[in-house]
Amino acid sequence: MLILVVGLNHRTAPVEVREKLSFSAKSLQGALAQLKSYPVIEGCAILSTCNRTEIYAATLEMDDGLNAIWDFLSRWSGVGISEIKNFTYSHTLYDTIRHLFRVAAGLDSMILGETQILGQVREAYQRAIEYESTNRVLNTLFQQAITVGKRVRTETGIDRNAVSISYAAVELARQHLGSLDGRSVLVIGAGKMSELTARHLVANGVSSVIVSNRSFERAVALAEQFRGRAVRFDELYRCMEAADIVISCTAASHCVVKAEEVSRVMDKRRGRAIFMVDIAVPRDIEAEVGNLAGVTLFDIDDLKNVIDQNLAERKQAAVKAEEIIEEELDGFMKWLGMQFVVPTISALKKWGDEIKQKELCRALNRLGNISEHDRKVICSMANSIVNQILHVPVAQLKSYALTTEGHLYTEILQNLFNLDVPGQKPKKQPAPAGIKEPVLAKKG
């Protein structure tokens, strides 16, 4: 059994191509059924996110399996096969397994070590199970990938440090304020970055969200997402008097938070400290605000320094993660290799047993009336001869099963002995140039 993947991601294809080759949750059942209908596909699963689409398949024929996946993608999306090949990558067997393990660990993501992808891998597997498109090999592969993803995060901490602007702001707030439970935040601006930062703050315990924006309607829309309160822009200093945290990210071309006004706010706060983060470019908060007593101010450059440091730590963790993946990959390959050779070994032993039984029957019939003792001696000798003849090829095949050449030697053995292995088709090797194919005489 061979495992393949054909995919595209943010590195290989622009968004206008990725969106054509994406699969919604509603379309997944039909897509898996269509892909599974190809005779060469024994099992399949589809991983589709905003940054990647990957088709995983189990097949008996590598080239035919790849062609089936490309044909499926073309028919499903309406994009030509040649164009799809320009934007996709493909891996087989060993490289497929390593690739999925790296994906689940967050090592192949746009943001190194991000956590969302592990849940997406789990979801892809669960949908394949639900829609009955997978098989035993893919089941074990995805289960192991999920285990690898968990192990990497537990043992390396690759996902512990913030590498986005919005989350870095939250991390700094937590470092300076301790627990964020019950804290209040004033968000100045109602754009995407303000929304992301507010969302992270609420997820980390902030209980009160106030949004101030020049467009009051947009402030209301953002505040409603967090059961917060919207205030008009001329009320922001009054609201600042009670806030623990201020996040500012407007599109203004000049500073909207003045040091003189914040100084008055701090007088009214009577020594109670305030934490402020200016995410805007150009800056929203005058730099002099950071010099005021009781004010801790960070700007976008401070956040980027935090992110750079955290990225360096994640890259260091990624080195350990790769070691874990190689260790897990070795274990999975041993399991997979044995799954492939065990049916062949059984077929070989069956082949030997059939010959033994046929020849024993012939010999015993010729010998006629012999004692039970002699019969047992002859049967024991026949068993011993067959077992000794098969011992070396069986032992060698088991040892090759643990290498990348396992499939090759298994196929050679199947061809040499013309073994009928359920679910595996021995490939008929063409005769070398200049040599005629042998003509086998018909029996009888």
From Swiss-Prot:
Point out the gene that encodes the protein: hemA
Q: Where is the active site?
A: C50 (nucleophile)
Residues with site note (Important for activity): H99
The entry's function note states:
Catalyzes the NADPH-dependent reduction of glutamyl-tRNA(Glu) to glutamate 1-semialdehyde (GSA).
Q: What is this protein called?
A: Glutamyl-tRNA reductase
Keyword Transmembrane found: no
From which domain of life does this come? Bacteria
- Give the pathway: Porphyrin-containing compound metabolism; protoporphyrin-IX biosynthesis; 5-aminolevulinate from L-glutamyl-tRNA(Glu): step 1/2
Give residues annotated as binding substrate. T49, C50, N51, R52, S109, E114, T115, Q116, Q120
The family database entries (InterPro entries) matched by this protein are listed as: 4pyrrol_synth_GluRdtase, 4pyrrol_synth_GluRdtase_dimer, 4pyrrol_synth_GluRdtase_N, GluRdtase_CS, GluRdtase_dimer_dom_sf, GluRdtase_N_sf, NAD(P)-bd_dom_sf, Shikm_DH/Glu-tRNA_Rdtase
One MF term in the entry's GO annotations = glutamyl-tRNA reductase activity
Q: Which HAMAP family match?
A: Glu_tRNA_reductase (MF_00087)
Q: What else is known?
A: During catalysis, the active site Cys acts as a nucleophile attacking the alpha-carbonyl group of tRNA-bound glutamate with the formation of a thioester intermediate between enzyme and glutamate, and the concomitant release of tRNA(Glu). The thioester intermediate is finally reduced by direct hydride transfer from NADPH, to form the product GSA.
Instruction: Describe, as the record does, how this protein assembles with itself and its partners.
Output: Homodimer.
Describe the family membership recorded for this protein in Swiss-Prot or TrEMBL.
Answer: Belongs to the glutamyl-tRNA reductase family.
Species of origin = Pelotomaculum thermopropionicum (strain DSM 13744 / JCM 10971 / SI)
Which EC class is the enzyme in? oxidoreductase
EC number(s) from the headed UniProt entry: 1.2.1.70
Binding residues for NADP(+): G189, A190, G191, K192, M193, S194
Q: What's the entry's take on its domains? A: Possesses an unusual extended V-shaped dimeric structure with each monomer consisting of three distinct domains arranged along a curved 'spinal' alpha-helix. The N-terminal catalytic domain specifically recognizes the glutamate moiety of the substrate. The second domain is the NADPH-binding domain, and the third C-terminal domain is responsible for dimerization.
Q: Which GO terms describe its biological process?
A: protoporphyrinogen IX biosynthetic process from glutamate
Q: Which UniProt keywords apply?
A: NADP, Oxidoreductase, Porphyrin biosynthesis
What reaction is this protein's catalytic activity?
Answer: (S)-4-amino-5-oxopentanoate + tRNA(Glu) + NADP(+) = L-glutamyl-tRNA(Glu) + NADPH + H(+)
